Amino acid sequence: MPTINQLVRKGRVAITAKSKVPALEACPQKRGVCTRVYTTTPKKPNSALRKVCKVRLTNGFEVISYIGGEGHNLQEHSVVLIRGGRVKDLPGVRYHTVRGSLDTAGVKDRKQARSKYGAKRPK
């Protein structure tokens, strides 16, 4: 416990919260260009080929973003919108691509949770 005199001299240091998505710079989304589209494997108990892309953002950051949903149309030089949100079993992936905006197409034949995958309402 510090004495009153020590607190007068120094004061308490406030704990500063560290951002989980620093590349967004306090914005809800950011635009970027795909520099590489590839698949990667998840951590230990899981097994799959997860679709990810390396994105160069408009602010100069280079980040890895997860492409959710079944199938995608992204390739190098595609313009994508990035939102925050990590993928627990992919180390280093802290962003998601927004489906159905800019060059990213929505998921085909999606019936449920359509708004999350940029799918229109089926007729």
From Swiss-Prot:
GO terms for cellular component: small ribosomal subunit. Residues 113-123 have a biased composition (Basic residues). Residues 104-123 are annotated as: Disordered. Gene3D superfamilies: Nucleic acid-binding proteins (2.40.50.140). Keywords: Methylation, Ribonucleoprotein, Ribosomal protein, RNA-binding, rRNA-binding, tRNA-binding. One of its GO terms (biological process) is translation. HAMAP family: Ribosomal_uS12_B (MF_00403_B). Part of the 30S ribosomal subunit. Contacts proteins S8 and S17. May interact with IF1 in the 30S initiation complex. With S4 and S5 plays an important role in translational accuracy. Interacts with and stabilizes bases of the 16S rRNA that are involved in tRNA selection in the A site and with the mRNA backbone. Located at the interface of the 30S and 50S subunits, it traverses the body of the 30S subunit contacting proteins on the other side and probably holding the rRNA structure together. The combined cluster of proteins S8, S12 and S17 appears to hold together the shoulder and platform of the 30S subunit. This is Small ribosomal subunit protein uS12. The lineage of its organism: Bacteria, Pseudomonadati, Pseudomonadota, Betaproteobacteria, Neisseriales. The gene is rpsL.
